[in-house]
Amino acid sequence: MTPIGVFDSGYGGLTVLDSIRSRLPEYDYLYLGDNARAPYGGRSFEVVYEFTRQAVMKLFSMGCQLVILGCNTASAKALRTIQQHDLPLLETNSTDNCKLSIVNCKLPRRVLGIIRPTAEIIGYKTQSRHVGLLATEGTVRSESYKLEIQKLFPDITLTSVACPLWAPLVEAGEATSPGADYFVKKRIDQLLSEDPKIDAVILGCTHYPLLLPKIKSYIPENVEVISQGCHVAESLENYLQRHPEIESQCSKNGQTRYFTTENPDKFQENARIFLNETVAVQHVSL
């Protein structure tokens, strides 16, 4: 069995997984949440890289050949180093990988992020060429969205606002509570006051789709709100079509397994918020 791996520091990656499964239901998936060490947003580049590298290697050891970083912070702070440093080392040391019990050790391995797929579509979502980004502090500080968008659409002006309390609100089950309105409105007002010309807003954290009803209630109707999940799923589908050597190795039984570094019962309870279903969860150590 060669599932597609999806990793997040917390629960937000479940929204990405849900979108991917809706578009590509035939594949097998393995979700890993490093919930015991979440959140990653305020951690340094070095720590996020090391934690993400550990998770990716764990997913490889569990049979994954392709891993999606369903976490903006990990995509911003760790993806490039893993792609440019760790993956080439794996390919040049395939014999050592077999000794380390990495399943299907001689197959090529790939790790993809979720920032690039979002940046690729933003130019087609704005008329004013003024775009807003709502994200965690770590993602905003990394300037990853700014760099990707400038490469693809240099005429776009990006204004970014950090929303440090939004993800904790979601994980606390408060996404629909009246108390969340204050924090949502505060950041949206800040964003639109910094650039009133914005006509498209990126939700740069995979937790934020659960706040979408509140977000839309405070954003003008002419401003398009862009969630990542469907665009990541479409990008993955295109990637698999372009890379038959990867796609042909992916198992197709329509099964999903869930793993967490924290208490499985707690994960199961919180996963219900994101997936609206009860899932079986196993504990894993990194």
Whereabouts are the PLM-identified features?
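Non-catalytic structural scaffold of enzyme domains
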Residues: 1-286
